[in-house]
């Protein structure tokens, strides 16, 4: 019995339908992920009617949820999602116009991070809506799809107009030193992961004909990022979000990559996942909300993807094996409580499903080529 078979036996018992082939595992989790896509093309963060509010569409989550379909060359699904995202921006173009003319003072004046997947309306309650990285990641992906993967997303002058306004929006914000709530939607700081997402987005979208990005806009981001790294922010030394600068954005040099990976593995890797940062209160199991941080499942897939891209096969396979142990019959949870087998209700988490599919695909594809 292979190691993969043993892992699935321990999870599912002795049932005949245990998926022991990696292609079957991918099919199973792709099916779970597809259930989260709505008619509009947008993905929910988690299952419908979940009490946590994760039955909404986040810009950032849709960026990561689409990655699985990209690696499997399902461009129809990818295009449908990004066409829907463009429609969101068009619906709220008046707000973008206002923000371009004068820098927003309050979080509600920023482009919001989450939307009703059917009406594309904003949710107005306070949710740390100041998330510059969510704009950076969308610019990055549209630029990558258009200029590198040759997948047409921008279809007419209205599309080009709204994308140009997103560039101008980041310029007005002065994203390189604009405090935001970041990937985790929490306290406002200047986050390296947010500055890096915007920088990567601007560098990629400038390759699309018809979109203008001033060189100074990129230079400002590069200088700011250089000053912050290897930290995530003034208050956070190491953070799971920093992995995004290695993959998918790939905007760091080798020394920076190695230092971030070393810090993440030493300080944040746990048994069932990767904690976001030390002192994370979200789903913290301890009454003091300090010392027992929740363990996020997609951290293992993220590390596997990075090590596969860096050519470190053994490390990539090791993190894939860790992620396989996190699977449940419902799919992959958002997180496990510290030092336990209990996971939270955001199961499946679309982001985790997509990262797992991508990691399993790339690691096994490489292994098969080498045989």
Predicted regions and their residues:
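Acidic, mature catalytic/reactive cores of soluble proteins
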Residues: 1-371
């Amino acid at each position: 019995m292979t190691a993969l078979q043993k892992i699935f036996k321990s999870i599912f018992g002795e049932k005949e339908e245990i998926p022991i082939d990696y292609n079957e595992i991918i099919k199973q989790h792709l099916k779970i992920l597809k259930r989260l896509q709505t008619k509009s093309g947008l993905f929910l963060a988690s299952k419908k009617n979940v009490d946590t509010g994760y039955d909404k569409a986040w810009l950032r989550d849709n960026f990561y949820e689409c990655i699985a379909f990209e690696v499997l060359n399902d461009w129809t699904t990818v295009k449908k999602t990004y066409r829907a995202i463009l429609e969101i921006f068009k619906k709220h173009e008046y707000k973008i116009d206002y923000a371009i003319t004068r820098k927003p003072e309050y979080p509600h004046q920023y482009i919001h991070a989450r939307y009703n997947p059917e009406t594309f309306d904003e949710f107005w309650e306070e949710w740390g809506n100041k998330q510059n990285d969510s704009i950076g990641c969308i610019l990055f992906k549209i630029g990558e799809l258009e200029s590198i993967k040759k997948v047409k997303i921008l279809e007419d002058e209205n599309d080009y107009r709204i994308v140009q306004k997103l560039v101008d929006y980041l310029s007005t914000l002065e994203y390189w030193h604009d405090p935001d709530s970041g990937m985790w939607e929490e306290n406002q700081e200047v986050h390296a992961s947010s500055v890096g997402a915007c920088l990567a987005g601007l560098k990629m979208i400038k390759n699309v004909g018809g979109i203008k990005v001033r060189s100074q806009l990129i230079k400002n981001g590069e200088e700011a990022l250089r000053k912050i790294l290897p930290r995530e922010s003034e208050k956070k030394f190491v953070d799971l979000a920093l992995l995004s600068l290695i993959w998918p954005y790939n905007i760091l040099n080798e020394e920076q990559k190695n230092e971030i990976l070393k810090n993440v593995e030493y300080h944040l890797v746990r048994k069932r996942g990767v904690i976001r940062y030390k002192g994370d209160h979200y789903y913290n199991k301890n009454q003091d909300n300090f010392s027992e941080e929740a363990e996020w499942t997609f951290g293992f897939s993220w590390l596997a993807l990075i090590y596969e891209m860096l050519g470190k096969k053994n490390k990539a396979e090791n993190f894939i094996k860790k992620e396989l142990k996190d699977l449940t019959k419902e799919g992959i949870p958002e997180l496990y409580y510290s030092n336990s087998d209990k996971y939270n209700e955001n199961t499946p988490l679309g982001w985790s499903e997509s990262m797992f599919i991508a990691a399993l695909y790339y690691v096994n594809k490489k292994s098969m080529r080498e045989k």
